[in-house]
Swiss-Prot record:
Highest taxon listed in the record's lineage: Bacteria
Function: Binds to the 23S rRNA.
GO cellular component assignments: ribonucleoprotein complex; ribosome
Single GO MF annotation: structural constituent of ribosome
Pfam families: Ribosomal_L9_C, Ribosomal_L9_N
Protein name in the entry: Large ribosomal subunit protein bL9
Family: Belongs to the bacterial ribosomal protein bL9 family.
A Gene Ontology BP annotation from the UniProt entry: translation
Record PANTHER family: 50S RIBOSOMAL PROTEIN L9
Record key words, sorted: Ribonucleoprotein, Ribosomal protein, RNA-binding, rRNA-binding
Length: 152
């Protein structure tokens, strides 16, 4: 079996790994492609310590983000229900629909917190009534909020 060299990736490379990963590759692949293109660095003890330090910092940052998401979830669920007023036509049908941006604006008005509209999941809202919205705050943290649609 041919000798393999250990490298630390500087960038994400499909089929090989993510930035900061320790990988073993053929010496020619490392010497002719990865190192000249600055996609990887030789895995020296100093570089390995640096990578481990970066991983620990990233782990701490992710823990802090998750904790903030949990606190935000708690405050969102304390609000209870959000009220959104829309113009109404026949049969209590609203003009237009309620969008995720409308929900994000209602959350900001009620709590003062910014919520990314891309993390909000709502059903199609075309009539007056009460609906449930799910707000994804972190990969495993989501808040449930009631939306009350009323006539303006």
């Amino acid at each position: 079996m041919a000798k393999r060299v250990q490298l630390v990736l500087n960038q994400d490379i499909s089929k090989l790994g993510k930035s900061g990963d320790l990988v073993e590759v053929a010496p020619g692949y490392a010497r002719n492609y990865l190192i000249p293109q600055k996609l990887a660095t030789n895995a020296t003890p100093g570089i390995l310590k640096q990578v481990e330090r970066r991983r620990e910092q990233e782990r701490q940052r992710q823990l802090e983000l998750r904790q903030q998401a949990l606190e935000q979830k708690e405050s969102l669920e304390k609000v209870g229900s959000l009220t959104i007023a829309k113009q109404v036509g026949e049969n209590e049908a609203i003009f237009g629909t309620i969008t995720t941006q409308d929900v994000a604006d209602a959350i900001k008005a009620a709590t003062g917190q910014e919520v990314d509209r891309r993390g909000i999941t709502i059903p199609d809202i075309n009539h007056l009534g009460t609906y449930q919205a799910e707000i994804k705050l972190y990969s495993d943290v989501a808040a449930q909020v009631d939306i009350q649609v009323v006539a303006s």
